[in-house]
Amino acid sequence: MITSYFNKIEEILQIVLQKEENLLKQAAEKVAESIQNGGIIQLFGCGHSHLLTEEVFYRAGGLVPIKPILVEPLMLHEGAVRSSKLERQNDYADWFLQDQDLQANDVLIVLSTSGRNPVPVDVAAYGKEKGAFVIGVTSLEYSKSQPSRHKSGKHLYNSVDLVINNHSVKGDAVLSYEKVQVPFAPTSTVVGATILNSMFAEAIKRMADNGYEPPIFLSGNIDGADDHNQLLIERYQKRIPLLALDGDEA
């Protein structure tokens, strides 16, 4: 099973590279343009998709102007089943979206593998309303196999400006075994992290080629990194209070 899972991940990553590379380059260009023009990159996901928003936040070797939109009831630690029920509610997003600082120079990345639930669709719509460029990371196979739960009938893939297909299968689980009735071994997190990090790597190259110094964190466990990182935090913490070193600085 270990080899089978590695093989499946490698297979899907190759499919993503072959089929999504041009779209990833378009997304990277938008990310680079946003940062060069004073914008930030905001990310949102519910449940396990939210893990990807934290994967790229305050990350050694990662971009500094990254802001995860963290809504605790939609995460897992306040109740896993509850978070799923809330994600399915139409208009649930209204209460937290009104507090979000989304601007026209920003890029908003919304992550949802099934792409069928109302909250990610509403977040994408709000981003477009605010003038941000909205990217969706989702599975087209999964989305098109299941009806939308949104009152408009829309999925995430037809609610955004640009779609990156993570090529997860319906249900996200890729392995089976004759003694197990339910498929297992999801792929969306591994592939999603690769999608985001490759997109940002390309954006960094493009900024550098444009003569703009990319704002990148050094690992805090390398001597001398704190001074480098603190200067970047001070540049962005007004728009990304989560970057503040302690609660008083937020």
Curated annotation (Swiss-Prot):
Family membership noted in the UniProt record: Belongs to the UPF0309 family.
GO biological process: carbohydrate derivative metabolic process
Name of the molecule in the record: UPF0309 protein BH0227
Domain SIS: 31-214
Alphabetized InterPro entries for the sequence: RpiR-like_SIS, SIS_dom, SIS_dom_sf, SIS_GmhA/DiaA_subfam, UPF0309
GO terms of molecular function: carbohydrate derivative binding
PANTHER family cross-referenced by the UniProt entry: PHOSPHOHEPTOSE ISOMERASE, SEDOHEPTULOSE 7-PHOSPHATE ISOMERASE / DNAA INITIATOR-ASSOCIATING FACTOR FOR REPLICATION INITIATION
Pfam families (alphabetical): SIS_2
Species annotation: Halalkalibacterium halodurans (strain ATCC BAA-125 / DSM 18197 / FERM 7344 / JCM 9153 / C-125) (Bacillus halodurans)
